[in-house]
From Swiss-Prot:
Upper lineage: Bacteria, Pseudomonadati, Pseudomonadota, Alphaproteobacteria, Hyphomicrobiales
Segments passing through the bilayer: none
Keyword Ribosomal protein: yes
Pfam families reported in the protein's UniProt record: Ribosomal_L33
SUPFAM superfamilies: Zn-binding ribosomal proteins
Alphabetic keyword roster: Ribonucleoprotein, Ribosomal protein
Species the sequence originates in: Sinorhizobium medicae (strain WSM419) (Ensifer medicae)
InterPro entries for the chain: Ribosomal_bL33, Ribosomal_bL33_CS, Ribosomal_bL33_sf, Ribosomal_zn-bd
Protein name: Large ribosomal subunit protein bL33
Keyword match Ribonucleoprotein: yes
GO terms for MF: structural constituent of ribosome
């Protein structure tokens, strides 16, 4: 079987609340680290989320 092109990643909050989203990305087209602005319900505001490895 061929290697999958999409991988699961964890988007970790930069507000240091420990909250994270799990999403997928195409590792062939998006080689750099992903950052997104999303809602953090613990901090109760929109913050930047950065990519981290799922353990």
């Amino acid at each position: 079987m061929a290697k999958a092109t999409t991988i699961k990643i964890k988007l970790l909050s930069t507000a240091d609340t420990g909250f994270f989203y799990v999403t997928t990305k195409n590792s062939r087209t998006m080689t750099d680290k992903m950052t997104k602005t999303k809602y953090d319900p613990v901090a109760r505001k929109h913050v930047e989320f950065k990519e981290a490895k799922i353990k």
